[in-house]
């Protein structure tokens, strides 16, 4: 067969790129469940240590551009997300954007921590309960960043785990108990951090039970990438009050 038809532009959908940690077992499934069919999702991986510490998180900065480059510039990505809440906190969201835009200069860049702050502001939530899986040094840096950006942290509940393989196996029941413990002192919302925590399926249940917004890393990142690309989350399966605000 020497002649055949082909499309000159086979993919006219919104194109999202996602830089996933090599140790993450969760975010890809949760993203697929949330994104509308009008979006194409392209994944790449970045080397990450199996143990989450301030030093190992900072080490990822040098690999961001190379990881982003595994998705060709010719794909013309609308938005690129760096899928690590703690990594973006330690490296700095602006530094993440600089590294990614060295490769994809015309793409917007989102991180979970900036997405969470935008989501909380969209919800009008200022008094926040936090749930993290991290060791204290990492949780404290994230807490400080939120405070610097005008949020009050009413409670911080952590599993205090440094091993990613364990984080990915924390049960839904354990996460729900932690959220309930953080939803105290008149919190406007609870923020559940980490892209490797399985959270998307518990958001609606917890919001109904507690009567406040639940914002998670994967939910907020999907919402932020979609809205940055001009896609209404009403077209998506992003859960919670966030998608209805």
Predicted regions and their residues:
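N-terminal glycine-rich anion-binding loop in soluble enzyme alpha/beta folds
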Residues: 1-67, 131-168
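Short, small-residue-enriched loops and turns at beta-alpha junctions
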Residues: 50, 85-90, 163-169, 198
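A short, acidic, amphipathic alpha-helical segment used as a generic capping/interface helix at domain edges
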Residues: 66-71, 171-184
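Glycine/small-residue-rich loop that forms an oxyanion/phosphate-binding "nest" at active or ligand-binding sites
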Residues: 67-114
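Periplasmic-binding protein-like
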Residues: 78-83, 129-130, 187-194
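Short, acidic/small-residue loops that bind anionic groups at enzyme active sites
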Residues: 97-120, 206-225
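Hydrophobic alpha-helical
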Residues: 177-206, 221-222
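C-terminal functional extensions of proteins
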Residues: 215-245
């Amino acid at each position: 067969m020497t002649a055949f038809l082909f499309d000159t532009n086979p993919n006219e959908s919104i194109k999202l790129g996602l830089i996933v940690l090599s140790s993450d077992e969760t975010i890809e499934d949760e993203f697929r469940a949330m994104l509308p069919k009008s979006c194409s999702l392209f994944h790449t991986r970045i080397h990450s240590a199996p143990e989450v510490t301030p030093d190992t998180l900072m080490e990822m900065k040098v690999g961001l551009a190379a990881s982003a480059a595994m998705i060709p510039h010719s794909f013309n990505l609308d938005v690129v997300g760096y899928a690590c809440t703690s990594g973006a906190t330690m490296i700095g969201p602006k530094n993440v954007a600089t590294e990614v835009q060295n490769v994809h200069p015309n793409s917007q860049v989102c991180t979970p921590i900036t997405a969470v702050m935008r989501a909380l502001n969209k919800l009008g939530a200022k008094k926040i309960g936090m749930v993290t899986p991290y060791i204290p040094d990492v949780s404290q840096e994230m807490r400080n960043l939120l405070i610097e950006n005008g949020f009050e942290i009413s409670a911080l509940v952590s599993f205090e785990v440094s091993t990613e393989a364990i984080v990915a196996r924390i049960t839904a029941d354990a996460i729900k108990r932690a959220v309930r413990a953080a939803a105290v002192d008149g919190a406007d919302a609870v923020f559940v951090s980490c892209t490797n925590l399985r959270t998307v399926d518990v958001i609606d249940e917890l919001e109904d039970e507690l009567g406040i917004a639940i914002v998670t890393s994967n939910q907020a990142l999907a919402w932020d990438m979609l809205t940055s690309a001009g896609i209404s989350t009403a077209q998506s399966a992003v859960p919670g009050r966030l998608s209805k605000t």
